[in-house]
Amino acid sequence: MAKEIFQRTKPHMNVGTIGHVDHGKTTLTAAISIYCSKVNKDAKALKYEDIDNAPEEKARGITINARHIEYETANRHYAHVDCPGHADYIKNMITGAAQMDAAILLVAADSGAEPQTKEHLLLAQRMGIKKIIVFLNKLDLADPELVELVEVEVLELVEKYGFPSDTPIVKGSAFGAMSNPDDPEATKCIKELLETMDNYFDLPERDIDKPFLLAIEDVFSISGRGTVATGRIERGVIKVGQEVEIVGIRETRKTTVTGVEMFQKILEQGEAGDNVGLLLRGVDKKDIERGQVIAALGTITPHKKFKASIYCLTKEEGGRHKPFFSGYRPQFFFRTTDVTGMVSLEGKEMVMPGDNVDIVVELISSIAMDKNVEFAVREGGRTVASGRILEILE
């Protein structure tokens, strides 16, 4: 069966659902998908089970990897990632967040903000997301007086993490909307959410004119066709026949892109902001991995030692309770990869939670990096600091 061509008729934007485990992120994603399929006959409805589609996830009822769906509103085409809320899987949320232009924060009205609500807000802020919309879910289960308190609490939290004070709140029941797609009263919250997304989220400025770069999120082999690397194009454009380099973790190697697809449709060219699959000539699945980048020839190089400015989270923000010293070895998250690195402090004996400091880091393997790239620092399953590269040393 021939694949259809992706028609670029509306501006494209990447959004995602974030928030605490069990607050209803996947249910909301499914409700949006079902609602859009009713409004737009060409759209395909994805049920909850289709989004949570790995066996382990079905068993535990939690989302582990970020899942992508697509839908259209009157004005835009959205790619939507459903981000995991479960603590062990925050690492996957980081790669999901790295692909988002804006986010929908889910908060259950019957329980209010919880620890992961805060961690996700912090990660969203670190990953450069500028605007969020709050979806106050499970309204049918909550005491109306409690809902008002939760609203105030959530807006305070949103402001605390640097998001605008006029962040909109949409209230409803994602489960109600998913279960009763033909009831206008039940789906009113989804309609309102989509309208708010169209009006409130600014279309991102895409770096189309810069040299091509995509951070690999996943690698598949397709029998008879070769190896496909998927991820979001961070900058530039990519066309079939273009020569590229695979950089980081291993030796840099050249290859040619023989196909570009998005949501199983063929693209004439992939542009900054698109979530694409690239078919690569002569590359074996075992030769490339998540965390490498595919880039225009000679535009990015792998490094392992750099100077960075970091902010250490306080205990209240979910960070460390104690200071750290030179020789500290946490995980550094860049784009879609995490690498262990050793911290050296210059002219400072220790770093306390809440400090802003400059450090030197030496990673155990080289990864593709540029000046000004942001990263998260994690240890023992939690984010302890966030930072930005000031200078590449070697």
Curated annotation (Swiss-Prot):
G4: annotated span: 137-140
Catalytic reactions on record: GTP + H2O = GDP + phosphate + H(+)
Subcellular location: Cytoplasm
Single GO MF descriptor: GTPase activity
Binding site for GTP: 19-26, 82-86, 137-140
Record InterPro entries: EF-Tu_GTP-bd, EF-Tu_GTPase, EFTu-like_2, EFTU_2, G_TR_CS, P-loop_NTPase, Small_GTP-bd, T_Tr_GTP-bd_dom
Region annotation (G5) ranges: 173-175
EC code(s) of this entry: 3.6.5.3
Region (G3): 82-85
Stored CDD domains: EF_Tu, EFTU_II, EFTU_III
Disulphide bridges: none
Entries under SUPFAM superfamilies matching the protein: EF-Tu/eEF-1alpha/eIF2-gamma C-terminal domain, P-loop containing nucleoside triphosphate hydrolases, Translation proteins
Record domain tr-type G: where: 10-205
G2 as annotated region, ranges: 61-65
Residue span of region G1: 19-26
Binding site for Mg(2+): T26
Keyword GTP-binding: yes
Main location: cytoplasm
CC terms in the record's Gene Ontology section: cytoplasm
Entry annotated with the keyword Magnesium: yes
Complex and partners: Monomer.
Homology family: Belongs to the TRAFAC class translation factor GTPase superfamily. Classic translation factor GTPase family. EF-Tu/EF-1A subfamily.
Protein name: Elongation factor Tu
Source organism of this protein record: Borrelia duttonii (strain Ly)
